[in-house]
């Protein structure tokens, strides 16, 4: 392993539309924003596990299913995807976060 291999992403990034299709086929969508952000609006079926508590709550995440992570813009979810990947999860980051989800015209829950 080279010096810079530790910086390589161990997860894929998918569009909001692809994430929705994966969710409909059994993937688990985790919203890593803070609770007040989630309460304003979130993707249907998304489970709230804020980035700050993600590592403490790994046992709540099914290891046998594909995991999708979303935040506001894609930054926190990218960090979350790295944490989950490091812990053996099959994970994908939702590109552009919930903002891109909404721009794509996908449903949100208020």
Language-model-detected regions and their locations in the chain:
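Rhodanese-like catalytic fold shared by cysteine-dependent sulfurtransferases
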Residues: 1-27, 35-66, 75-110
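Short, surface-exposed ligand- or partner-binding patches at beta-edge/loop junctions that are enriched
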Residues: 70
